[in-house]
Amino acid sequence: MRTTNHLYRTVHRQGKPLLPPLHLYRRILRAHRTFPPAQRALGDEYVKSEFKLHKNIDNPVHIIGFLASWQDYFHMISTNSWAEGTLSKSLVDQMSSEQIVQLYELMKETKQLGGASAESGSSLS
């Protein structure tokens, strides 16, 4: 992400300005503090691994796409608009089979976590 300073200026002229990678990374981790502990741990681990994996990317298109996607994610979690989010058919059609499997696994895990918290909450009554 060495060429990102030039990219910020370019993207700023075309639309929303992109945050520098380190600022975005820190803001996402701060936003995760509002999550329940299990979700926070999962989110923090995922964010850290993704930023680490993309640390040495030099392709400007990949850098812009990566930062724009994470900035959209940050905006969603900081405004709680993720709760009403859905995936369009066109977005799912663009996903690779590996991404669809990951999405399915994530869905299963979140349903299990939701079921476990609902069960533990009902046992306290």
Curated annotation (Swiss-Prot):
The keyword Repeat does not apply. GO terms for cellular component: mitochondrial intermembrane space; mitochondrial matrix. Keywords: Chaperone, Gluconeogenesis, Mitochondrion, Transit peptide. It comes from the Eukaryota. Its main location: mitochondrion. It is found in: Mitochondrion matrix. The keyword Transit peptide applies. GO terms for biological process: gluconeogenesis; mitochondrial respiratory chain complex II assembly; succinate metabolic process. Plays an essential role in the assembly of succinate dehydrogenase (SDH), an enzyme complex (also referred to as respiratory complex II) that is a component of both the tricarboxylic acid (TCA) cycle and the mitochondrial electron transport chain, and which couples the oxidation of succinate to fumarate with the reduction of ubiquinone (coenzyme Q) to ubiquinol. Promotes maturation of the iron-sulfur protein subunit of the SDH catalytic dimer, protecting it from the deleterious effects of oxidants. May act together with SDHAF1. Interacts with the iron-sulfur protein subunit within the SDH catalytic dimer. This is Succinate dehydrogenase assembly factor 3, mitochondrial. It comes from Eremothecium gossypii (strain ATCC 10895 / CBS 109.51 / FGSC 9923 / NRRL Y-1056). The lineage of its organism: Eukaryota, Fungi, Dikarya, Ascomycota, Saccharomycotina.
